[in-house]
Amino acid sequence: MYQRNISFSDEVDIRSSRFLHLILYPRFSESEYEKRIAELKSLGITSIILDGRTIVNGIRVAGKGCVGLVVKAKSGSKVYALKIRRTDADRKTMDNEARLHIIANSAGVGPSLEGHTKNIIAMEFITGQNIIDWLDDNSEKPRIRSVARAILEQCFSLDRASIDHGELSRLARHVIVSNRPYIVDFESASTIRKTCNVTAATQAIFLHGIIASKVKERLGNTNREKVIQALRRYKNSQKRENFEVLLDSLSI
């Protein structure tokens, strides 16, 4: 949810024609429209800010996924991120995602969930950059190590809370770096499957893919064999002691 400068024209009423086909995307339904407007009102939403890096139907939004669109909204003077369920989503409500988001919040992870309805989740809006853009703008080794450790600490908290995010191998879409990193989007999370948050994030940051390549350019090589051995030890027993061994192997 990257912040850009906002002009007055970006802010519209919740009944604006510019927002009409976002509140029920991709298929508009007159019968459902008033229901979703009522949901927005129940959350205290007074206006929508059409801003973001993603374009949907010619309109800027904060994000777009398989389950929902993310738009920026206001309740009085407070700014929120709204995740609005797509009409073609693979689920009928946002209730389970909201439940999992609350569990993550209880572990100290994720933007604060402020409220939810059948079709909408309202949460704290995080002003920041995705981790790839952030790495492109930052080269200070201590800061990169600090952010990497903070991400893994949050992953450890999720592991301890028995909630698996499910998509942390794709960190660019699920971590926003502001004054600190935030893990976002719990639509694929589960409290049933085995947790592998630390494992997935470690591999994404240090071992495989574009993020790992950028981190390597800035921090230098890691001892891959030592890291892999530490990961195996942690996967076998997700104890703090083993997590500390992993952090040590990563020099963070």
Model-inferred region functions:
Residues 1-59, 246-251:
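Juxta-kinase regulatory segment immediately upstream of eukaryotic protein kinase catalytic domains
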Residues 33-34, 42-96, 102:
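ATP-binding glycine-rich loop module of kinase domains
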Residues 72-76, 125, 177-179:
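Active-site beta-strand termini and strand-to-loop segments that position acidic
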Residues 83-117, 146, 205, 209:
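A conserved alpha-helical element in kinase catalytic cores
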Residues 102, 109-149:
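Conserved structural core of kinase catalytic domains
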Residues 153-166:
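Protein kinase catalytic-loop region centered on the HRD/HxD motif
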Residues 163-167, 178-252:
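C-lobe/activation-segment region of protein kinase-like
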Residues 171-177:
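Hydrophobic residue at the +6 position relative to the catalytic HRD Asp in the kinase catalytic loop
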